[in-house]
Regions:
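Short, solvent-exposed loop/turn and secondary-structure capping segments
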Residues: 18-20, 97-103, 118-121
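Extracellular beta-strand-rich recognition modules
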Residues: 7, 28, 72-95, 104, ...
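Short, surface-exposed tryptophan/glycine-enriched loops
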Residues: 79, 136-166
Length: 172
């Protein structure tokens, strides 16, 4: 195990992690904003414990063309033989995929975050199936009552063995 983070600390982001994002105008960021998209430590998550990192897009009509990026970046880690990345998250996949409200990707950098390559894309059938999840992303295919589903993809890091990498959880 190279890195484990459960987001249970009162400090967010955790030591060594980086949060960055696009700031919108004050009228869109606060109060009656049409978009709410930030990484925050929240309580009441049902993954495990009381803390989690959350990124949420609250899409409403009338704000076409808004582009906001949010990043949660791990500290640099050395990738060992047979390493894989496993993370658990909740996703309203039916709404997310059907309405194209956003993009959720996991990215990797081998140059301390100067450049990023896609490692896993929530909109890619190949990435989803290769990580052990079910495609298509909708409540009927997933056999769930509501649209929220707890997911734990497993992504190979074989291409990065012996390298020092940073992993980014990216939402736009």
């Amino acid at each position: 195990l190279v890195l484990r983070e459960d987001f249970e600390s009162q400090t967010f982001p955790p030591s060594g992690w980086v949060v960055k994002g696009t700031e919108l105008s004050e009228d869109l960021e606060s109060g009656y904003a049409h978009w709410s998209l930030n990484w925050n430590e929240v309580t009441g998550c049902s993954i495990a414990g009381s803390g989690c990192a959350e990124v949420m897009s609250d899409f409403k009509e009338g704000q076409a063309g808004i582009s906001k990026e949010e990043w949660l970046i791990t500290p640099a880690v050395q990738v060992a033989d047979n390493a894989s990345l496993s993370f658990t998250f909740w996703c309203n996949a039916s709404s997310f995929m059907t309405n194209k409200y956003g993009s959720f990707l996991v990215k990797v950098s081998t140059d301390d975050g100067d450049t990023w390559s896609d490692l896993w894309n929530a909109a890619s059938q190949e990435d989803i199936e290769n990580s052990g999840l079910t495609w298509p992303w909708n409540k009927d295919a997933m056999g769930i009552e509501n649209n929220w589903q707890k997911l734990t993809p497993n992504v190979s890091l074989e291409a990065y063995v012996g390298k020092t990498v940073k992993i980014a959880f990216y939402f736009r």
